[in-house]
Structures are given as C-alpha cells and as structure tokens.
C-alpha cells in the first residue's frame, strides 16, 4: 500500500492546481473591480514613478512625474487644496513596485498588486498566530482570517493599494526572526520595512535598543549593511535621491489631511489644539522611555509586548502618519486576543468574538458616517483615535500576563518538577 508521502509526491499538482485556480480567480475579481472602480491612488503614485525611472530615466520625485500622476488621477493637474499625489517613499521602495511597473495596463497591474496585498494580509494573520502562539478553534479561526482581510484597517489599504500591508508583514517577520535567533534575517527585514519610515522608525529604534542590550550586534550590522546597499544602488540612477526624497517628505504635510493628533486637535480647537498635541507627545514619550528601560535585557515575551506598545503609541506621538497605515496594529491586536484566550478560555473566546464584531462594525460605521468626497472617499480624522485608544488600554490590561511565561509553559514545568 503506498504511503501518504508517496501519494503526495505523485499528486502534488492537485493542490498546486487548486492554488493556481484560486489565484487566477482572485486576480480576475480584482481586475473587474479595478475596471469598475478607478482609484488605487497609493499604488498609482508609485506605479507611475517607477515607470518614469525605468522607461524614461526621470526622477520619480520630479514635478513632471507628479503632474503625470495627477493627470491620470484627476484628468488634470491638481488644484490648490487637492492631494498632490507625489512620490514620497525612499527610492529603494521601487524594488516592491518594479515587477508591476513592467505592466503597461494600469488596471491589470493594480489587480495583481491587490492580489499580492491580499496574500500579505493572509500572511500577516498567519504570522500573528505564530508570534503569539494563539490556537483559536475552527470557527474562531475562520472568523479571524475573514476579519484580517475585511476589517476597515485591512480592506482600505488593500483598495487604495497601500504598501503598508507589506511593511506590517516585514515587521512581523522580523519579530519571528528575532525570536528564533536569526538576527541577520531580522536586520534585512527591518531595512526593507523602512520603505515607509514614519511607520516603523520608533519600533526599529526600540528593536535596536533591545538587541544591543543583549549584545546581538548582527541585527544592527545587517540593518545598516542592507540600508547602505539599497541607498547606494539607487544612487546609481538618481545620485541625489536622498535630498530629493527629503524635500518631498518636508512637503508632504502641506497637501495631506492632518497627520498627527496635534494637527487634528488644531483643526478642532485652534486655540489649544497644538498644545494638546505637544502634551500628548510628551506623555507618550515618557511612557515609552520607561517601558523601554524596563524591557532592557528581558526575554522575548517582555520585548514583544513593549514592541507592540511602541507600535501603537508611535501612531500618536507626533510623527506624520495616517489611519490608512493602522494595519500595522493588527499584531498588537492579536497579542491581546491571544492573552485573553490563554487566561480566560471559553469566556475569553466570547470576548474576542464580541470585540472583533465591535471593531469591524464600529470602524466601518464611523468611516461611512463621517466620509467626505473630494474626487475619492476621504476618511475623517476621527479615525485616528478608536483603535489606538482601545489597544493602549487593552495592552496595559494584559501586560502582567503578556510579559511573563505563558500559563501553559509554567504548568508544563511544574508537572515536570513533580516527576
């Protein structure tokens, strides 16, 4: 009788064919969506910018390229007050966009990009389970994966074509590499995550602080080596690209919606909003310094909880960002869920289900109720607050259990000692 391994070796093409069929079906659905729903401006910006450099040798940071992007999006150059749709990522981000920039049909390129982002959301969900050791039951697992793709902070960057989904995957992959001692891989993944530097700057600084406290110098070394190679290789095509990129970064807040809580507060309460923003920055900065010092030389569980807190608080600390980037907060959310089930079992599972439903329905309802239309749906600044506020409260709620060895591990050791 043939073994199962022999059977699989002979009929491996069956699951491969099923996977390919699903991939083609999803891409076809994305293509039809792209045809019927123009947009995906986050992707459009970098698709045009990469093609300009690849086919014309033109810097993606140039005004000429910005006007090309605006014409494709608006049918004309951007008017005062409209989003200028300029390339603001580091030039080495084009590594991600290059395969798609080779496709001249924008709708097809966008459809394939969306398929890749959908794969990224699934991978992020898998990494969340591996990082936290969470083993939800079958029905909760199905809801978990549906939530990962369809919740507001997952589906919106998917539709817009935001590369932040890949940044979240790279961060989660770096955490896994750090836990398993693969420091070289962690450094490389962290370097590539800097394609959206404002999203990862504080988590990367904390990771370096923690790894250096453990004398794990290879993380810093490989991060630096990778960044130097990426920067130098791009300088072969645009020698002064770091200066051009810096100009775009400084220009970015001028044509974007409020990108910090302080900017949001200033719009709501002009008399005191800016001071409130600086006060929030100071409070969060002090908290992070204290938590970083507490995590110094501690084990991975303590480090991981602090990294999740850093990721959440960095969205409010005053660095320019956008609620469209909040998919990076999926991993802290999974940590909270994992601790709840670990501590409270069945009651924890019901709590997880209730919170998922509340987050899913609440964020979408808030977006729909507050949306404005400026040629494309524009989210209200109020979306800066619900998820980070919940996560800060929830992370401190589970802190005691999250930073210590899991209950299952302790019980296993106790049983071993009794033998």
Language-model features: where?
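Membrane-embedded alpha-helical segments of multi-pass membrane proteins
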Residues: 115-120, 165-170, 196, 200, ...
């Amino acid at each position: 009788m043939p073994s199962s391994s022999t059977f699989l070796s002979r009929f491996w093409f069956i699951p491969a064919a099923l996977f390919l069929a699903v991939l083609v079906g999803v891409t076809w659905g994305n293509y039809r969506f792209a045809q019927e729903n123009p947009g995906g401006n986050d992707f459009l910006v970098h698709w045009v910018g990469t093609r300009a450099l690849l086919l014309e040798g033109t810097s993606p940071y140039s005004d000429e390229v910005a006007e090309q992007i605006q014409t494709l999006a608006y049918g004309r150059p951007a008017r005062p007050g409209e989003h200028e749709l300029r390339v603001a990522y580091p030039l080495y981000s084009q590594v991600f966009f290059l395969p798609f920039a080779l496709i001249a049909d924008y709708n097809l390129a966008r459809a394939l990009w969306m398929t890749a982002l959908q794969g990224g959301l699934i991978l992020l969900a898998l990494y969340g389970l591996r990082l936290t050791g969470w083993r939800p039951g079958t029905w909760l697992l199905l809801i978990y994966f549906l939530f990962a793709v369809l919740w507001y902070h997952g589906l919106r960057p998917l539709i817009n074509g935001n590369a932040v989904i890949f940044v979240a995957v790279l961060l989660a992959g770096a955490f896994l590499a750090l836990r398993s001692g693969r420091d070289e891989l962690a450094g490389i993944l962290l370097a590539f995550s800097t394609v959206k530097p404002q999203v990862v700057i504080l988590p990367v600084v904390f990771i370096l602080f923690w790894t250096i406290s453990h004398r794990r110098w290879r993380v810093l070394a490989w991060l630096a080596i990778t960044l130097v190679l990426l920067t130098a290789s791009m300088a072969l095509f645009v020698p002064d690209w770091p200066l051009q990129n810096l100009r775009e970064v400084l220009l970015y807040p001028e044509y974007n919606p409020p990108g910090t809580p302080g900017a949001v507060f200033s719009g709501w309460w002009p008399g005191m909003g800016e001071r409130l923003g600086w006060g929030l920055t100071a409070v969060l900065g002090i908290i992070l310094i204290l938590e970083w010092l507490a995590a110094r030389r501690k084990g991975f569980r303590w480090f991981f909880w602090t990294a999740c807190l850093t990721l959440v608080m960095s969205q409010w600390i005053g660095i320019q960002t956008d609620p469209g980037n909040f998919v990076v907060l999926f991993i802290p959310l999974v940590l909270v869920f994992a601790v709840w089930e670990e501590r409270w079992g069945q009651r924890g599972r019901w709590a997880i289900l209730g919170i998922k439903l509340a987050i899913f329905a609440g964020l979408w309802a808030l977006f729909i109720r507050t949306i404005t239309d400026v040629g494309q749906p524009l989210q209200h600044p109020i979306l800066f607050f619900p998820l980070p506020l919940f996560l800060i409260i929830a992370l401190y709620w589970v802190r005691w259990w999250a930073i210590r060895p899991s209950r299952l591990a302790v019980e296993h050791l106790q049983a071993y000692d009794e033998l």
